[in-house]
Amino acid sequence: MNKWDKRFMELTCQVATWSSCFRAGRQIGAIIVKDNRILTTGYNGAPQGVESCRDKGECMRDKLGIPSGTRHELCYAVHAEQNAILQAARLGISLKGATLYCTHQPCVICAKMIINSGITRIVYKEGYPDEFSMQLLNQAGVQVDAYDNL
């Protein structure tokens, strides 16, 4: 592992603490980097102007008994990877050739956004039970590295 991967993953874990997700263990962070410079950050949380689950004091998914990794549409939060990509779009920043550092392996919805954004490498810390996302990323030529294997 090189010093930059270590530094950016440490920062990604710090960004995850900004999450407004109420669900235990679901604080996710993401940083998009190019040429060893941070372009954007993202964490999972409610869209701008929408009350977060943390502020409400409950998780809609827990209340409805929805297991992690399913029915993503039934959640107030925007995923960390999505927020980082959306910030780049909002600011007019190209992500072509960038690296995404994230605390968790991206889901299939995020994988599709990552592919189309031009990100060419992902470094993730925690695995996620979504083989389809990995298939898509591999097929699209996105390099995916588990942090512990670097």
Q: PLM ranges: what are they?
A:
Residues 1-150:
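Zinc-dependent deaminase catalytic domain
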